[in-house]
Amino acid sequence: MKYLFKKIEPKWQAKWEEAKVFEAKDNSDKPKFYGLVEFPYPSGAGMHVGHIKAYSSLEVISRKRRMEGYNVLFPIGFDAFGLPTENYAVKTGTHPRIITDENIKRFSNQLKKVGFSFDWNRVIDTTDEDYYKWTQWIFLKMFEKGLVFRDRTLVNYCPHCKVVLSNEDSQGGKCDICHSDVVQKSKDVWYLRITQYADKLLEGLKDVDYPDNVKQQQIHWIGKSKGAFVNFDVDGIDEKLEIYTTRPDTLFGVTFMVIAPEHPIIDKYADKITNMDEITAYRNECAKKTEFERTQLVKDKTGVRIQGLEGINPVNGKKIPIYIADYVMMGYGTGAIMAVPAHDQRDYDFAKKFGIDIIEVIKGGDISKEAYTGDGEMVNSDFLNGYAKKKDSIERMLEELEKKGIGKAGVQYKMKDWAFNRQRYWGEPIPLIHCPNCGVVAVPENELPLRLPDVKDFEPGEDGQSPLAKIDSFVNCTCPKCGAAAKRETDTMPQWAGSSWYFLRYTDPHNANALADMDKLKYWMPVDWYNGGMEHVTRHMIYSRFWHHFLYDLGVVNTPEPYAKRSIQGLILGPDGDKMSKSKGNVVDPLDIVEEYGADTLRTYVLFMGDYGAATPWSENSVKGCKKFLDRVAAVSYTHLRAHETLAN
């Protein structure tokens, strides 16, 4: 007797839905279990086998917890704003709302066909006005608390998508969305001050059950370092160049400085620079390079000495040359660095190329061959000579810097403030107004949600402005403070916005008066177990932890951390062992498997295909093996049932 999945699975899936057996009960007397999976982006391609693996582990845990007497919340929703839908809308002329609704309907039917035990009464959609009202509300609270600011800066810009990208969305110099080359462009950018929460994000990792590699990735992403800010005078002008260094003890070995090509001191003192034509030509070349290209460690060292300006080493008074070089960025640190070529390989290579002095200040290597980056006894360093422990020499130098007023201890982070605006249509409108009298003003809370207007042209302007900028009825408004004619902000939020708090809305998805009721939050939060992909442990998880910490400080949520536990699933590779992609023709459609072998076979195979956290190639033979196993289970069950019937008769 075989497992008759085409008869059995639809029957029980219908009964589950009719009886609402997977709906969670708020404030139950039972112990609670909140299992969370990363809600999907409802693409036109629909569900893939990666979704099956991502959801199957907590699906099993959730069913087990229900059998153990827990009140289980296992929700699903859709992270539906984003560029792919908008690009498809531009291509086809179909409104993103229509595309999104169709994709969500198809995706929901697919999920139900696979038999997941989601609570379908709590489905959320980030493009729903009742949802993004609260995304906008959180943004306004951040604006009130000074966590939102605007700055004109060089940004990562995708010419194909016509959108500004954060550093996180343009790694490797490629657009995360379309994989086109990213260019640098000067634009006004809205930022969220995530760096103000850097220490809380680091401290919070001590209180959660995350895999070590997840914690380490987040620690590395935040990139906290302790060091010193030091001021270098510039000879002949009333100006100081501030640098940050983690090794202030090596100041006696500084033989040159490097500043970013965009550093304002260049234009400010252009009349004193005798090779301004050469400087300008080099700056123009740098402007053509992406941040990724500029900061690559393995590349030819380029730079130009600034003739007419010299720095002064603050600890020994020696004059040192100042260069501009592409590897120094204004967005990192102070836009200026001190160079110690004897003990930093990049500085060493630069010094060798340009014939700059190399002074050893730490014994232990052969600086005629390469930089020495290890520890050792301090030499050629005046009051530090003889110090052998790095910690002691740094502390002594900090004392000297602070005593003389030329520097102080400080902290820097690799993580930068979050670039938060996009010049596209299909995203949450940023609820701010530009008034000629009052400056930037918040949209009043009672006017939320600030709705997306209906448009026919979704294409961004050639000037890089959002499609919303073309709609006068949306742009032109009245200042809520002074009543003057004003203009709305026309940029929209990035796709990461809606996913930064969605786990809270699941606890109270139909609340019109708050993002969630505090009693329900106290019952359900924190999430007991969150499963997802390794690709989201930095951006999404750090962003959502940041928002949650902010809401906790605001008194809106009851826990500082949103997720008590995190697990990671590995990729499902194609049968050929390569990553699945349409271009390679190795994509496996999960619904084809459901149709041929059944949903239970598919989920059984995904759970037994190998180490859950490892990348594993798809095997059709193993799928067949799982179906044979279920056939044997069915045969035993049918035999057992017939025996019972015989005894009963």
Regions found by a protein language model. Name each.
Residues 1-36, 71-75, 102-105, 285-323, ...:
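Conserved oxyanion/phosphate-binding beta-strand-loop segments in alpha/beta enzyme cores
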Residues 25-96, 123-138, 245-246, 313-350, ...:
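N-terminal catalytic cores of NTP/NDP-binding nucleotidyl/phosphoryl-transfer enzymes
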Residues 58-59, 71, 263-366:
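Catalytic alpha/beta core of large soluble enzyme barrels
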Residues 214-219, 224-242, 290-316, 460-493, ...:
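Flexible, glycine/threonine-enriched loop-and-boundary segments that flank and lead into catalytic domains
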Residues 243-262, 492-503, 536-538:
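Conserved phosphate/anionic-ligand binding catalytic regions in large, soluble enzymes, centered on
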